[in-house]
Structure formats: C-alpha cells, structure tokens
Design a protein with these regions (language model features):
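C-terminal interaction modules of eukaryotic adaptor/scaffold proteins
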Residues: 139-169
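Alpha-helical scaffolds that organize eukaryotic protein assemblies
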Residues: 114-117, 129
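EF-hand Ca2+-binding helix-loop-helix modules
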Residues: 1-49, 54-94, 101-111, 125, ...
Length: 169
C-alpha cells in the first residue's frame, strides 16, 4: 500500500478500538489478511522497530514507516524469486545488499540458516521479511551503542543480554 489515504483507511479499520494506535495482535491479524503470516514475536519486533514513542503500539505515522520497509523488502523478494516463490541463499545475500545490509560470510550463513524454518535452503517471503526485520533491528541497536560511529562496540555482559533481548524474534 503506497497511497497515504488508502493506508489511513486500512489503519483505521485495523484500529478497531479507535485509539489511534494498533497493537501487535491487531497488526498480526491485518497482515494475515494480506497473506503475510508471522509469529506474534515477529510482529512485536516490527512494532519495536518503528515505535518511536515506545508505548508498545503503533501509531499511523509509525505504521507508514513500517509499510515503507515492508514494501521495499517485498519488492526485493519479488525481483529475486524468479517465479519460484522462494529465495536460495545467494538470492538472500543479494536481497540483503539491495536492502542496504552488508554481512560477512559467517554472519550471513548463521542468519540465513536460522530463518530457514524448513532447513531446505529455501527462504519464503515471510521468512525473508523476518530475516530483514532481525537484521534491521540489530543494526538499529548496534548503532545506538556505536556512539563514536567506528563500526565497533564493546559490551559488558548486561549490555550483551540487553542487546540480545531487544533483537529477539
């Protein structure tokens, strides 16, 4: 959905309680209508990525940001899936590069394997979106610790646990 008017109408339908915010459960149900099935934990991570006021829900403006991200990731998937309906690891790597991520080989293979639910070397759209959400969340959190913008951070154990818990899916 690209048109803001259409997005607003969609958002208002999902916001059944008319609070101006949608919950993870409401967002999960709405995404399922569009054939995007995600575990609640992934939807909660989507909200955390764009929840600028940190209230645990998603306002319309926050939703617009998520929608833009999802459209970009879906387009990359569509461009690379070559009519198969899934990506192979080489496609996933290219897709990550096209979405602005750069991972070294060990990191890439670990992430790719962890999002290959069936362990068959095929990443479907929902898994690719989940993978991109994880990498984006990790990048956002890493950048918050990388105060000198050197591309390196030092974490004590408590910070590591905090980091890990915030990137969980």
């Amino acid at each position: 959905m690209e048109n803001k008017t259409i997005l607003r109408e969609w958002f208002e339908r999902v916001d059944s309680e008319k609070t101006g915010n949608i919950t993870a459960t409401q967002l999960k149900s709405a995404l399922a209508v569009g054939n995007l099935e995600f575990p609640l934990s992934v939807v909660q991570q989507m909200i955390r990525m764009y929840d600028s006021d940190r209230n645990g829900t998603m306002s319309f403006d926050e939703f617009v940001g998520l929608n833009k991200f999802l459209l970009k990731v879906q387009q990359v998937f569509s461009d690379l899936q070559r009519g198969r309906g899934y990506l192979v690891p080489d496609d996933v790597y290219e897709g990550l590069v096209k979405t602005g991520f750069s991972l070294d080989s060990p990191s890439f293979h670990t992430v790719c394997e962890s999002f290959d639910r069936k362990k068959n070397g095929r990443i479907h759209l929902d898994d690719f979106i989940s993978l991109c959400i994880f990498v984006q969340s990790a990048r956002n959190l890493f950048n918050s610790f990388d105060t000198t913008k050197q591309g390196r951070v030092t974490l004590d154990f408590n910070q590591f646990v905090y980091f890990s818990a915030n990137c969980r899916i």
